[in-house]
Amino acid sequence: MAGKMKLFSVTSERPLATKIADYLDIPLCEVELQKFSDGEVKINIEESIRGTNAYVVQSMNSNVNERLMELLIMVDALKRASVHSINIIMPYYGYARQDRKARSREPITAKLMANLIQRAGADRLITVDLHAAQIQGFFNIPIDHLSAIPLIGDYLIENYGEKDVVVVAPDHSGVVRARRIADRLNAPIAILNRKPRPHEDEIMSVIGDVKGKVAIVVDDIIDTGVRATTSADILLEKGAVEVIACATHSVMAGNATERLQNSNIKEVITSDSIDLPEDKQFDKLTTISIGRILGRAIEGVQENRSLHPLF
């Protein structure tokens, strides 16, 4: 790819962007972001970037609407600064759970997100463990859909590989994700048969044997923590000796951290796709960095190499 590499962080993922910069051995470019009294945002890039390949790190965490607007303004600033290409590094893709019309007269906001990012001028999106892989089809630009599952799998092998484990999909749609972890651990899988009702979390049955085993529940997102804690309760009721909760993205909305810390879950394993503030940290939480795989992805894009090993 023609053009020198330039790495930017807008607001949401400065710690992760710093890890990526350290891996690539390049500095983060200076960006001045002003917020006016009415909430408007203004961005100024503090150096010449004409003809470069811009890589912008921005997750859709905390206030997703504000993060999205910052990103769109940043993309516009880069385009008007005559960069060669604009590559978005969005570890956590916001609105991913609104990927279809579940009921009549509902929007498909994940598609709207794709439209906005493309119309603003982005040339590529690099993301991690989309809630629904088919969201890739909402884009007409290249998407590199990476996964934190291998990193989480390696951690589980190191810490639970000698134990009798079962990998649990929290619902039927999570079986593929659970299977990837189970294959790495050479372990069986179980499935929680949930009743698909909005605003309810009722588990009707457990499909598979969990008795006497360490149950590892694998999900893509931990939001309020209710789904993880109810999963743990039913698995322990069915005879599991311990429950470990894993998810790539830790939203930790509301009192999720308190709920998880006080739950029957032994350990919560997640990535740094979302930067959690100090008040969202808790003793049971283990965070695995995805900075290296994102850095390798940027290297691959920059040097026109295959990213297949990162998927």
UniProtKB/Swiss-Prot annotation:
Protein residues bound to D-ribose 5-phosphate: 219
GO BP term, example: purine nucleotide biosynthetic process
The EC number(s) this enzyme carries: 2.7.6.1
InterPro entries referenced in this protein's UniProt entry, alphabetically: PRib_PP_synth_CS, Pribosyltran_N, PRibTrfase_dom, PRTase-like, Rib-P_diPkinase, Rib-P_diPkinase_bac
SMART domains: Pribosyltran_N
Superkingdom as given in the UniProt entry: Bacteria
Pathway info: Metabolic intermediate biosynthesis; 5-phospho-alpha-D-ribose 1-diphosphate biosynthesis; 5-phospho-alpha-D-ribose 1-diphosphate from D-ribose 5-phosphate (route I): step 1/1
UniProt keyword DNA-binding, yes or no: no
HAMAP family given in the database record: RibP_PPkinase_B
Main function: Involved in the biosynthesis of the central metabolite phospho-alpha-D-ribosyl-1-pyrophosphate (PRPP) via the transfer of pyrophosphoryl group from ATP to 1-hydroxyl of ribose-5-phosphate (Rib-5-P).
Assembly and interaction partners: Homohexamer.
Name listed for the protein in its UniProt record: Putative ribose-phosphate pyrophosphokinase 2
